[in-house]
Amino acid sequence: MDLLVDELFADMNADGASPPPPRPAGGPKNTPAAPPLYATGRLSQAQLMPSPPMPVPPAALFNRLLDDLGFSAGPALCTMLDTWNEDLFSALPTNADLYRECKFLSTLPSDVVEWGDAYVPERTQIDIRAHGDVAFPTLPATRDGLGLYYEALSRFFHAELRAREESYRTVLANFCSALYRYLRASVRQLHRQAHMRGRDRDLGEMLRATIADRYYRETARLARVLFLHLYLFLTREILWAAYAEQMMRPDLFDCLCCDLESWRQLAGLFQPFMFVNGALTVRGVPIEARRLRELNHIREHLNLPLVRSAATEEPGAPLTTPPTLHGNQARASGYFMVLIRAKLDSYSSFTTSPSEAVMREHAYSRARTKNNYGSTIEGLLDLPDDDAPEEAGLAAPRLSFLPAGHTRRLSTAPPTDVSLGDELHLDGEDVAMAHADALDDFDLDMLGDGDSPGPGFTPHDSAPYGALDMADFEFEQMFTDALGIDEYGG
């Protein structure tokens, strides 16, 4: 064991590494070095990753990644994905071109060895909340601009995702470097022990065999939690900011009808419209209320805004219903790994010769010892033509509006953690709420504040989201804390 430790520190000295920064003083040992979880709606706050990890066992390396991300709930969320059949990820862009030059993802162990021996970990500060060059869109003044708003919000999401994924790619490379150096030190230790026992073995062959046996499996494990953090936190951040604006403009969505190209557009994590009160359909077929409740159950557990539709929801029914798991159908975890494998296989697919490409396309000719990042049943499914993933993505939803006089309003208020009425207690005293019941029968129309505002009335604040000052952000955070938006954490 001492020799193994010496080997690890010899590797660190050779690479010019410095010890990792200490954890915050005065706190428990497991205090994360990363900043707290994302504050809802704050699109400009940076999150800098600590220095690259040391070569440690894979389990410790995995825990270090969770600690650096502040993502302790990551493994539980990965397990939760295995209990749902919804395709939450196929509508997201793969951005596989970002990984075409990532040699550390090669399925040839010799490439990994060559890369690992030469790679110097990136020690500059890595901001995993980097931003793209597209501005956050604001809601239009009239409903006629909702189509352009949908496209603008989608472009903003894709730009933010690509900018942040470049940072996540660097983080993955640093952790793969630490993993490789640990495996290399372990193999050298075993090689010395074998030599002392009179059994000479080839060091290079031992290292390549170890990489084939452990490196790809552990890399896929790291990538799974890393990219789940990317997709989930970015989607939360953008959608809660958009939700806060859309909730204040019900006039834009009361008559909105949205016809989707595929159910995947509604089941996906990123859903630009969270209020569609006119009609919500997939190729002209209305969405069932039960299906919408099941989808919202998943979104609630992922701490994403619910999708609301007055035309679909049943009056008096709950907003969420636990979905039934069908063991013979694809699962969300499988769809997620299909997306991850598109990234991990990008380098090998891009550098593969034509003859190797034929072997990759035909399962009967694949080598049984071929290294890979695992497989899922979802990769073997024959999807129907109307739901098959396309490189160009799905078409934008077709928007229309109900005729005048057919306005629909939600019958159920958004769920919050704020309780009123007989559950309200002031300073420990019992307060009679009987007189407050009169408010239920109070007609607000007597105040002249009906659905049609008077002349000169501005229905919303036209200031762009990015123009808010820090005082606005602080008030917004107090408001979201009261609603329990960050309740689920991680």
UniProtKB/Swiss-Prot annotation:
Stored InterPro entries? Alpha_TIF, Alpha_TIF_sf, HSV_VP16_C
Positions of post-translational Phosphoserine modification? 18, 353, 411, 452
Q: Which SMART domains match?
A: Alpha_TIF
Indicate whether Cell inner membrane appears among the record's keywords: no
GO MF terms here are:
core promoter sequence-specific DNA binding; DNA binding; DNA-binding transcription factor activity; DNA-binding transcription factor binding; molecular function activator activity; RNA polymerase II cis-regulatory region sequence-specific DNA binding; structural constituent of virion; transcription coactivator activity
One Pfam family it belongs to:
HSV_VP16_C
Q: What GO cellular component is one of the record's annotations?
A: transcription regulator complex
Disulphide bonds in the chain: none
- Stretches the record annotates as Transcriptional activation: 411-490
The entry's function note states: In the early stage of viral replication, acts as a transcriptional activator of immediate-early (IE) gene products (alpha-genes), which is released by invading virions. Recruits P-TEFb to the viral alpha-gene promoters and overcomes transcriptional inhibition by ICP22 to promote transcription of IE genes. VP16-induced complex represents a regulatory switch: when it is on, it promotes IE-gene expression and thus lytic infection, and when it is off, it limits IE-gene transcription favoring latent infection.
As for family, the record states: Belongs to the herpesviridae tegument protein VP16 protein family.
State the protein's name.
Tegument protein VP16
Instruction: Supply the source organism for this entry.
Output: Human herpesvirus 1 (strain 17)
Species lineage, top-down? Viruses, Duplodnaviria, Heunggongvirae, Peploviricota, Herviviricetes
